Amino acid sequence: MSYFAFLSEHGPTMLLGTVTTIKVLVCSTILYVIISLIFGLMRLSKNPLIQGTATVYIEFFRGTSLLVQLFWFYYVLPFFGLTLEAFTAGVVAIGMNFGAYGAEIVRGGILAVPKGQWEGAFALNFTPAKRMRKIIIPQIFPIILPPAAN
């Protein structure tokens, strides 16, 4: 079978698979970014309940393989009354798994911001939320981009 005969026979199926893969990539990346920011900030909280919740989530999803998580989301959750379509189960499992790794990247990026930046924001009398939003978060993107894009 020649290349062109194979492509004419299986090309539409391969194209459909490529489009589905791109959809999963985009949706799980959006979920990954949201989870990473939320749980990365939760991990730095001084409240032990918030920090503990983030730690349990991160350690669970980093400690189990993605294949096991995909299996659980698609095959085991229906036993508990929560049935997800294959696409949704894949997006949620991949997003939550990568989000756990991303949360540690965000936490490390925040801790890598020089202490002088924190002190400068404190000297300007910024609230903790404004300090993060205006000073710290914009500075972490160059720090976290290489490990997050790897």
Q: What positions do the PLM features span?
A:
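Transmembrane alpha-helices and adjacent helix-loop boundaries
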Residues: 1-150
